[in-house]
Amino acid sequence: MTTFQDKVKALRAHHEELLSRKNEPVEWGNGIYEKYKNLILTAEHTPLEWRYDFDEKSNPYLMQRIMMNATLNSGAIKWNGKYLLVVRVEGADRKSFFAVAESPNGVDNFRFWDEPITMPEDVVPATNIYDMRLTAHEDGYIYGVFCAERHDDDQPGDLSAATATAAIARTKDLVNWERLPDLKTKSQQRNVVLHPEFVDGKYAFYTRPQDGFIDTGSGGGIGWALVDDITHAEIKEEKIINARHYHTIQEVKNGEGPHPIKTDKGWLHLAHGVRGCASGLRYVLYMYMTSLEDPTKVIAEPGGYLLVPEGPEYIGDVMNVVFTNGWIADEDGKVFIYYASSDTRMHVATSTIDRLVDYCMNTPKDDYRTQFSVEKIKALVAKNKQTLSK
């Protein structure tokens, strides 16, 4: 007869096998990055102590008392030699919360810290919080900027009506957080990211103005704004630095991912773009670069997407989606790109700064017409004929 303790032992062994599974790159890639074979985080990776009551008297059937639904959209930072993700964990009750998962190498063996993050409330409590962007700022703090969702009380009869604001918190240890007032803006905001350096002595934000909770409406793309005081942050002026365009991967909306990586050629940016299709909205990742001297000036933008949902990545709670809000650049130039697929689970892809700069600088831009796309392909064919004939 299988005892309660036998079941617990088997459960822990199964969980440890999942956590300790080694990861390796897929065999064939595109030369820009390598995806990895195994998922790095799923709902099943969350600690058993978060889900099970291990008291046989109160839980004789060893049921999950608190179920987890997804691990997604994670901020990332290299801290004390470890690769840390501040994960958006979504429970079965649809409420998201933040929790730190730590890896020794950035690609596998991610383990959650003992408890989720206790995030202090704003003056007006949020119903849901999610999608944190982490920035180790030159002022000495680690900042987390995330979406705070509340019901839109101007529409009392609509239980799906919501508002989105950019919440700001800061920490020195990723355990104890100081909640600052939400970013004050003229419109709703998602996908707000703090630039890692002062610009003209001010804090700089990448923004995404939008008319509604989901629809960007008149919002033109990824914006840029300066703020005098981070403890009472207010955006009075913002300008679009990476716009949306008709019949492109960012036709419907776009948003900054993690904060950009500084290179000797410029700032590397990773973003998401959204277009409509017959099955709904399709989310992909793309890149662009801005000038070191003027971070609002785009100096390179490869045409098309960098990374899309492939195979099983397409399936999940929200289909046909990849999303990122975290990457880590190592001292040796290796880059870890952390992305979620279909709002369900977390993946990693790796590249290098040199490869990503090359990709941005030397991939043809989108000229917005089929004719120009064909001309670029034919030019490459002609170049290859000449090269291969030597």
Task: Tell me the role of every PLM-derived stretch.
Residues M1-N73, I77-T127, A136-V193, E197-V252, ...:
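Beta-rich carbohydrate-recognition and catalytic domains
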Residues E310-Y314, V322-W327:
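Short glycine-rich, acidic/polar surface loops and turns
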Residues I328-G333:
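Well-ordered alpha/beta subsegment
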Residues F336:
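Short, surface-exposed ligand- or partner-binding patches at beta-edge/loop junctions that are enriched
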